[in-house]
Curated annotation (Swiss-Prot):
Summary of the function given for this chain in its UniProt record: Has antibacterial activity.
Family, per entry: Belongs to the beta-defensin family.
Name of this protein: Beta-defensin 38
Disulfide linkage: 29-58, 36-51, 41-59
One MF annotation (Gene Ontology) recorded for this entry: CCR6 chemokine receptor binding
Example GO biological process: innate immune response in mucosa
Organism of provenance: Rattus norvegicus (Rat)
UniProt GO cellular component terms: extracellular space
Predominant subcellular localization, coarse grouping: secreted
Keyword Transport: no
Gene this chain is encoded by: Defb38
Signal sequence bounds: 1-21
């Protein structure tokens, strides 16, 4: 029983992987050392572009 649960866990982790750097806008954001957020940017950050094909915001620190 333990082995079957472990195999199911490994299989589910393998099938549901998320590759975050697949989009061109996401790669540009990460290369500029900015951070992608699906919701609003944090308090001391501004939105400079988009990530994940326009679904998220690329946020840059203000200081």
């Amino acid at each position: 029983m333990k082995i079957s649960c472990f195999l199911l866990l490994v299989l589910s982790l393998y099938l549901f992987q998320v590759n975050q750097a697949t989009d061109q806008d996401t790669a540009k954001c990460v290369q500029k050392k900015n951070v992608c957020y699906y919701f609003e940017c944090p308090w001391l950050s501004i939105s400079v572009s988009t990530c994940y094909k326009g679904k998220a915001k690329c946020c840059q620190k203000r200081y």
